[in-house]
């Protein structure tokens, strides 16, 4: 429970209705308590941190002035929504964020009526809010709809599709877009738009003149004086402020204003509430505001584990196993030294994808395209047509956003593009929006693709080299976190395409493990005396080995950290069917549902693809193996 002596105002707020009982003069004190409580809470639980600190005042102002949940707030991405959750009935549970059965890390409609739209990926808020505004208008509802979007998310093309639609509608939608401009996404925001917005923060005088003129002249299009002023402004506006872009798209632009000045925020929002049609409010904020260490290291404090706020983040001592991301990070630098044709592309995920070192050592071969997955993939395709060897470093969940480009621009033309796909399979605490549960299914159906899934760190390095040297599109899909700890070979060696690895020779049943499931499968196979295969390739499958195993085994069990539907196991069944081989098969994988947020270990166990789950599934199907398993357990215990 919250300490009412430390938080005398916040302790009285369970919902925004409680917030609205305060006088406007008290809001700054409420914001100060909310910021302190967020620092204390995330220090205990971990979670997304700096983004929430940057929108404390904005969150308070919005819930104070708008009649939420009747008026609807749509938060882009959701990294910044912990303060929103605290003010909307989840204050005393916020310490459970990201934990199994705890508060969701992103807005989730099933969790609260105040979470009006589920998010996790960026740049969706304006489209969603516009849809809500249109539906409300058609229903005769006089509700306000507000989309809050960061400048990093504004780099995605979907944003401009929504702005273009909203600004050209008749009747005009009752929509407010708030641009939360902190010059950051997860990493530093990049690109021409970011530079343009950056100029705005130094143009307050000109903006004041513009806004004053609007009040005097009004915005009536037929006012001759106003038309003259607008023509004069056309000559100068591009030099100073970003209003041109938004106003030419049909939005009334206000700002920029200080997003940490509550009186200014409240005043601006009061005015905007009275206006009709699409509005855009530009606020300048600081990511990590109010916690000095986070302000100084906005990337490092974007998402944190539990820590002591009085000390800040402390590096863990001692050697640790490299993560798969670390393996990729080292490989990409080693390969760049060996192959001058290699170029690397990332859609705004330099830190997460392990490209910090590469970006510093090879800046002319590193391309951060901002949050633009579609562009990233087609950019790689264009590079490949000129003999370059592009690598697209991307999270599995974000590759979904560039799927048409993967098919249409890369695979159809059989171009040499390597997709280094991080966070494949079960991801964990970030929940369904960040899971990589679908990638093997949507990759293996694409003609010309080679799809690989490493069982360990050494194999990951080999597969990356194999994919880069393959003539055609290739994908290496690896999980979040660490592997089994296999020693790495500095050599840049390749694997034969489509060849599996026999891990253990047994009898009766063959366990076919793909990727991160191989270690657990091998442990079960050795215990029960079964054959175990590290399949390595999801496409092409090792046809020769599968047909040979089919001659001397009674059944196959496919095991993958991907949905069963259309996955690697389905490919095995299709191959056997095409060859006229009748073989009983048990497919183990992820369920036909979106998994909730929990630890990776919890989710693997729930899906039955950890060691205990594989063992239980095999024995349930073939109970006659129980005696063998019991003998092994007795031997281990004795």
From Swiss-Prot:
Biological role = Catalyzes the acyloin condensation reaction between C atoms 2 and 3 of pyruvate and glyceraldehyde 3-phosphate to yield 1-deoxy-D-xylulose-5-phosphate (DXP).
Q: What PANTHER family does its record include?
A: 1-D-DEOXYXYLULOSE 5-PHOSPHATE SYNTHASE-RELATED (PTHR43322), 1-DEOXY-D-XYLULOSE-5-PHOSPHATE SYNTHASE, CHLOROPLASTIC (PTHR43322:SF5)
Tell me the cofactors it needs: Mg(2+); thiamine diphosphate
InterPro entries in the cross-refs: Dxylulose-5-P_synthase, THDP-binding, Transketo_C/PFOR_II, Transketolase-like_Pyr-bd, Transketolase_BS, Transketolase_C, Transketolase_CS
Q: Which catalysed reactions does the entry list for this protein? A: D-glyceraldehyde 3-phosphate + pyruvate + H(+) = 1-deoxy-D-xylulose 5-phosphate + CO2
- This one is known as 1-deoxy-D-xylulose-5-phosphate synthase
Q: Name one GO molecular function term.
A: magnesium ion binding
> What is one term from the GO cellular component aspect held by the record?
cytosol
Instruction: List the SUPFAM superfamilies hit by this protein, alphabetically.
Output: Thiamin diphosphate-binding fold (THDP-binding), TK C-terminal domain-like
Q: In which pathway does it act?
A: Metabolic intermediate biosynthesis; 1-deoxy-D-xylulose 5-phosphate biosynthesis; 1-deoxy-D-xylulose 5-phosphate from D-glyceraldehyde 3-phosphate and pyruvate: step 1/1
Task: Kindly indicate whether the keyword Transcription belongs to this entry.
Answer: no
HAMAP family on file: DXP_synth
* Annotated residues for binding of Mg(2+): 151, 182
EC number per UniProt: 2.2.1.7
Q: What is the annotated quaternary arrangement, including any partners?
A: Homodimer.
- Keywords linked to the UniProt accession: Isoprene biosynthesis, Magnesium, Metal-binding, Thiamine biosynthesis, Thiamine pyrophosphate, Transferase
* One Pfam family here: Transket_pyr
Which positions bind thiamine diphosphate? 79, 120-122, 152-153, 182, 291, 373
Cofactor comment text: Binds 1 Mg(2+) ion per subunit.
Assigned protein family: Belongs to the transketolase family. DXPS subfamily.
One GO biological process this protein is involved in is: isopentenyl diphosphate biosynthetic process, methylerythritol 4-phosphate pathway
């Amino acid at each position: 429970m919250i300490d009412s002596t430390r938080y005398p105002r916040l302790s009285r707020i369970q919902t925004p209705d409680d917030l609205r009982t305060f006088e406007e003069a008290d809001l700054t004190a409420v914001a100060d308590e909310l910021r302190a409580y967020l620092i204390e809470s995330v220090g205990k639980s971990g979670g997304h941190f700096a983004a929430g600190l940057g929108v404390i005042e904005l969150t308070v102002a919005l819930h104070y002035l708008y009649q939420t949940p009747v008026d609807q707030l749509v938060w882009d991405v959701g990294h910044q929504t912990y303060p929103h959750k605290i003010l909307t009935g989840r204050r005393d549970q916020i310490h459970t964020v990201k934990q199994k059965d705890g508060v969701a890390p992103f807005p989730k409609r099933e969790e609260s009526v105040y979470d009006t739209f589920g998010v996790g990926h960026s740049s969706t808020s304006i489209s969603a809010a516009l849809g809500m505004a249109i539906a409300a208008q058609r229903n005769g509802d006089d509700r306000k709809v507000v989309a809050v979007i960061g400048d990093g998310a504004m780099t995605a093309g979907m944003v401009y599709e929504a702005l273009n639609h909203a600004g050209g509608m008749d009747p005009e939608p009752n929509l407010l877009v708030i641009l939360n401009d902190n010059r950051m996404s997860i990493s530093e925001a990049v690109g021409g738009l970011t530079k343009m917005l950056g100029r705005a923060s130094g143009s307050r005088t000109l903006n004041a003149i513009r806004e004053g003129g609007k009040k005097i002249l009004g915005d009536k299009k037929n006012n001759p004086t106003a038309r003259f002023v607008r023509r004069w402004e056309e000559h100068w506006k591009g030099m100073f402020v970003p209003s041109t872009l938004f106003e030419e798209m049909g939005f009334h632009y206000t700002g920029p204003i200080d997003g940490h000045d509550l009186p200014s925020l409240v005043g601006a929002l009061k005015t905007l509430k009275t206006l009709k049609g699409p509005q855009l409010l530009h606020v300048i904020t600081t990511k990590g505001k109010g916690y000095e260490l986070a302000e100084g290291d906005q990337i490092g404090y974007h998402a944190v584990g539990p820590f002591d706020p009085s000390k800040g983040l402390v590096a863990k001592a001692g050697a640790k196993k490299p993560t798969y991301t670390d393996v990729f990070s080292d490989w990409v630098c080693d390969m760049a030294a060996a192959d001058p044709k290699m170029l690397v592309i990332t859609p705004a995920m330099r830190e997460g994808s392990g490209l910090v070192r590469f970006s510093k050592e090879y800046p002319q071969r590193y391309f951060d395209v901002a949050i633009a997955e579609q562009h990233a993939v087609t950019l790689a395709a264009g590079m490949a047509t000129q003999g370059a060897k592009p690598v697209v470093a991307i999270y599995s969940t974000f590759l979904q956003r560039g799927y048409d480009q993967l098919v249409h621009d890369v695979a159809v033309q059989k171009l040499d593009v390597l997709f280094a796909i991080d966070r494949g399979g079960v991801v964990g605490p970030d929940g369904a929006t960040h899971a990589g549960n679908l990638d093997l299914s949507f990759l293996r159906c694409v003609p010309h693709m080679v799809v690989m899934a490493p069982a360990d760190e050494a194999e990951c390095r080999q597969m990356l080299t194999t994919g880069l040297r393959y003539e055609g599109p290739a994908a290496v899909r690896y999980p979040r976190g660490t592997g089994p700890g296999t020693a790495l070979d500095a050599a840049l060696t390749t694997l034969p395409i489509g060849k599996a690895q026999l891990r253990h020779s047994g009898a009766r049943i063959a366990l076919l493990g793909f990727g991160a499931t191989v270690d657990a499968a091998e442990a079960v196979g050795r215990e029960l005396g079964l054959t175990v295969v590290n399949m390595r390739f999801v496409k092409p499958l090792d046809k020769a080995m599968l047909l040979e195993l089919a001659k001397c085994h009674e059944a196959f069990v496919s095991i993958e950290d991907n949905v069963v539907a259309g996955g690697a196991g389905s490919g095995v069944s299709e191959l056997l069917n095409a060859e006229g081989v009748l073989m009983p098969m048990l497919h183990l994988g992820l369920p036909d549902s979106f998994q909730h947020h929990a630890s990776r270990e919890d989710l693997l166990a729930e899906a039955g693809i950890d060691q205990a789950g594989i063992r239980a599934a095999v024995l349930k199907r073939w109970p006659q193996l129980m005696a063998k398993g019991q003998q092994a357990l007795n031997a281990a215990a004795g």
